[in-house]
């Protein structure tokens, strides 16, 4: 059986892959999405959409869906000292080309909306891959996969690696990576904070030994994040709720919770891969290219920005384009990435 040909195949259907597919939905280009994942994205994560990116999401046609899914508005960021005294409030930047507030919504809901929009626009999405391989032939990429006891194959002119921090595409093609791991892990708690106003804010407390962030989650809940020493990890994982309340009250005077539970420990990492320099048309995006964890949704908003810029770079192509046509566009895109985005991610 002859493998179906696509203009673009994207390995990874998370935020980055979904965002690029949606950004391309009116381009006329055929897109294939492939992912090992069969369930939702990380349900423990909540993402905050920057005001400056909301016009982009409106142009993609997904803003109304995000609001219908329960996205809530957040005002600025409030800073407090170790005694709980207010230092300053950083307001939301105002301008004609940005939203009036941050929007926050669970990570998996944003991903589901992007994927549903992509599929409605004609993209082919295949999930639950148990195995896949990548080869080159006659100016194309060839992808073979196994999913649910069925095999499949496709060819594409351009390949996009959007398969996360531990990118398999990057590993298989031996693309260099610059990674920096930070000294202290980040502990995350989840709870329902008392006295939260209808106008949610991100609150940061500058305690004596650490910075504690109280991050709004949908439904009136709050995510608490702070660095911990490795020897303290056991405390946060095993101590009863009352102990968590007492410790947090020491760091954030005047803050109290109706409920508070341990969530997770995250090892902070910042990494950037080199652009692909080998044979064929390939580009890395999302965490496969630039990862910052945890980073208060900077990674997701950067995904949106990069997807929009890459889609704009490909706008001049028609379906059936050749490798010779797309390679100069990818070179221009990488140069723009280096000039505009690399300083933001440094």
Residue ranges and their predicted role:
Residues 2-14:
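Beta1/beta-strand and adjacent pyrophosphate-binding region of the FAD-binding site
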Residues 17-18:
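N-terminal Rossmann-fold NAD(P) dinucleotide-binding loop
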Residues 25-45:
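Glycine-rich FAD pyrophosphate-binding loop
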Residues 277-294:
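Short FAD-binding loop at a beta-strand-to-alpha-helix junction that anchors the flavin cofactor
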Residues 2-5, 55-172, 180-188, 241:
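Conserved N-terminal helical subregion
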Residues 140-153, 158-268, 272-277:
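Conserved FAD-binding catalytic core of PHBH/FMO-like flavoproteins
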